[in-house]
Amino acid sequence: MKKWSYAKLMTSALLLVFLSIILLAFHGGSRGDNHLYDHVAIGTKDILMGRKLKDLKPKTESLKMINPKKKNGFEYSDQVSSDLSRQEVFVDMMARDYQGPKPRSKPLKNN
């Protein structure tokens, strides 16, 4: 085999490996959805049961309803419904416990 053909073969092989790595790296990030997840705080009983909320009725008007056709509050993923939105709602544990900024106590003066 000539030197120039060996160099072309090695370059082509390395380019193929590089492109394969790039394609595999970006393949895992796309799951066919729009990657917009709504973070909602729910009770610890539901978290311990491992349930994911599928549909949630907002408590304030500033929140956008995920599924406006739903009449009762919310429905879990293990309950069957024909009008469920396919967008999953993930639990945000910190939102449930957050009560605003905590006041800082004044530093003690050592005289």
Curated annotation (Swiss-Prot):
The modification Hydroxyproline is found at P107. It comes from the Eukaryota. The modification Sulfotyrosine is found at Y98. One of its GO terms (cellular component) is extracellular region. Keywords: Differentiation, Growth factor, Hydroxylation, Secreted, Signal, Sulfation. Residues 33-96 form a propeptide. This is Protein GOLVEN 8. It comes from Arabidopsis thaliana (Mouse-ear cress).
